[in-house]
Amino acid sequence: MYSVSNAWIKAHSGFLAPEGFVELSCYIPDLQETLVYTKSDLISFTHHQTGDLMSGELPKNYIEFSLDNSDGRWNPSNPKGLEQHLSERLRITLRYGFEINGTVSWIPGGVFYLSEWRTSLNGIAASFVARDVLEYCLDRPYTGSISGTLYDVAERAIGEAGILVDDTLGQFVLGESTLGGFVLGDGSPGTFKLCDALKRYSVENIEYDKNDSIAVILQKCANAAGCVMYQKRNGVFAIEKLRYTDTKYVIPMDLSYTYPEIEFMRPIKNVSVTYRDGKKLLYPFSGSGETQTLDNDFIATEAQAFEVAEWVCSNLRSRRNITGEFRSDTRLDLFDVVAVESKYGTISGVVLTDIKHTFTGAFRTTYSGYVRGSGVAVAVYCGEVFAGEVI
């Protein structure tokens, strides 16, 4: 969760909260100009983040928005229009604002790169999609070797994408590369940060699927080291251990549009880990339930497979997922640990794995999270719709 002032927290927690704001800025090299769009310019806006506690699926972080095109400024046939100056990977910076004591305070929302746009000749709106840096590693096949530590493999994969090491930052900087990489849009650097946990595990000369993309290689490294993948608000894409620090944040019923819904999944009886050369480890967890399977040839030894199985069980022991919708709080991030107020009590230890902020005249946030905490004494499925007006 992004840290803000006490005034921000106090203002947002009030039932009659001040107005929220969103701002998108994009530098256009052809024009040598930065285009800035605020809430008044947006017809619609969505910011969606998803992540997997097991790194079993690739994370996603993207924005979709539409702008007024009634004057034809985005028409492709307009010789003085803006569409001709668009190109893939233009850097778009997002920030969120909140009115406090008559002025707007801002916090970063993320860094994205233009991937799609649609500007019809006679349309009254132009729509755009921008995604995080990982998106540009999805269709680039990995051609290097799998040897050394997982850190070495991840570093090699990042290098193939054109990412250089900046030792002064301790991060990987995406820029011009002699390895056939690419530059993001305006030449601005994107950054990657790798956890030292990747240095604990070694892999040697593993045969892998030649169709595996750079993103998949990074995902396998994260999974084999018990790490998660996600992009931070400053544009840094991280592979690191999840610390599950409780933010002490509560999603209150007063600001919710619906009662939260709890989904119960079958408990885990054991975890089956398939590791290098097709070897298997069966890790018992409880007396009944289903078998959770994990297949990763980057897991090199039985000891490592045992650690991964323990990690899976510690994350998935609750087998409860919660979803809801409430008045937006743009401080919330992927993998934040929060509490959710329900009709019958407060559900604690909820790790957010899917969070979406939308604006179509007013802000809303929908969320999904995995319950790692004790939850409520009596778990109840609540499907009734809150009928009151939430401002």
Please provide the spans of the model-predicted regions.
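Assembly/oligomerization scaffold segments
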Residues: M1-G148, R156, T178, F182, ...
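Acidic, low-complexity/disordered segments
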Residues: M1-S13, E19, F128-A130, C137-S145, ...
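Short secondary-structure boundary/capping segments within folded domains
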Residues: L35, D52-L58, G287-N296, E302, ...
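Broad, structure-driven detector of short, well-ordered beta-strand segments within folded domains
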Residues: V228-Q231, N270-Y275
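Stable alpha-helical structural segments in soluble proteins, enriched in small hydrophobic residues
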Residues: A303-R317
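Detector for glycine-centered tight turns/loop "hinges" at secondary-structure junctions
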Residues: L31-Q32, G102, N234-G235, G278, ...
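Charged- and aromatic-enriched interaction segments used to assemble
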Residues: T103-W106, R118-E263
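Short beta-strands and strand-coil junctions in structured, solvent-facing domains, enriched
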Residues: C227-V228, A309, T358
